[in-house]
Design a protein with these regions (language model features):
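C-terminal helical subdomain
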Residues: 181-182, 186, 199-248
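Conserved glycine-rich Rossmann-like NAD(P)H-binding loop of the short-chain dehydrogenase/reductase
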Residues: 26-45
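Hydrophobic positions on the long internal alpha-helix
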Residues: 88, 122-126, 130, 171-172
Length: 248
């Protein structure tokens, strides 16, 4: 069974950018969204969207690095709609705002597990079903702070987060090189006023100087890039919310 709809899977969809992706995609015709959350029962806004768009928004339990759980979600998608066209790997953490000199190994491992390994596990689980889609887009939410060219000179102290984003950028580029029939790329959403960014601002004087855009603005802009993305214009590149190509 397949459908004429475009089918999306969004990780980290219970709040912030992920939730906004679900909101905007759910308003599109011929679109089905599977919204991943660690605790679907507690994701009140996602449940409300599911009730508003029955059969078109599905809330699923999706945890970073959970191989069996990720595979179960993809199998659920296969059984319900028979295809998976676009995955947006949005789930991430940023809960240790300090310079690298003071970062613990445990914090580095936690950020790497969720932000890097979790993204790879999601791709591995989604791959068999995505392979059958003519669209085959796997989009990673990246960050300019993880640019090796730009990030080290930023004055904000986002050590473990930035390092993990640099690593997941490489994962995306390498996956594109290894999978020629996919469109795979990271995209920076810009500074966005999410709970995660506001929390980081409260612990970093430099970040506090830079107010974020609304999630609605950022996601609408990113969707324009994602919609128009091809292997030639975006695959294996570090895209920006503006549509420009960022430096690695």
């Amino acid at each position: 069974m397949t459908t004429s709809n475009t089918v999306y899977l969004i990780s980290g969809a219970n709040r912030g950018i992920g939730l906004e992706f679900v909101k905007q995609l759910s308003e599109r015709p011929n679109t089905v969204v599977f919204a991943g959350a660690r605790n679907p029962q507690a994701a009140a806004e996602l449940q409300a969207l599911s009730a508003k768009h029955p059969g078109r928004v599905h809330v699923v339990e999706l945890k970073a690095c959970d191989e069996q759980g990720n595979a179960r979600v993809v199998e659920e998608i296969r059984q319900k709609v028979g295809q998976l066209d676009v995955v947006i790997a949005n789930a991430a953490i940023c809960n240790d705002v300090q310079e690298l000199l003071n970062v613990s190994p445990e914090s580095m491992r936690e950020h790497f597990d969720v932000n890097v390994v979790g993204t790879l596990v999601l791709f591995q689980a989604a791959y068999p079903l995505m392979k059958a889609s003519p669209t085959r887009k796997f989009v990673v939410i990246g960050a300019k702070g993880g640019s090796i060219t730009l990030g080290p000179e930023y004055r904000s102290a986002l050590g473990p987060y930035a390092v993990s984003k640099a690593a997941v950028h490489y994962v995306a580029k390498k996956l594109q090189f290894e999978n020629e029939d996919f469109v795979i790329f990271p995209i920076c959403p810009g500074r966005v006023s999410t709970d995660m960014y506001l929390s980081a601002q409260s612990n970093d004087a430099e970040l506090a100087k830079h107010p974020g855009e609304t999630p609605a603005f950022s996601v609408a802009s990113m969707l324009r890039v994602i919609d128009g993305a091809t292997r030639e214009n975006a695959g294996g590149k570090f895209m920006d919310v503006s549509g420009a190509v960022n430096e690695w």
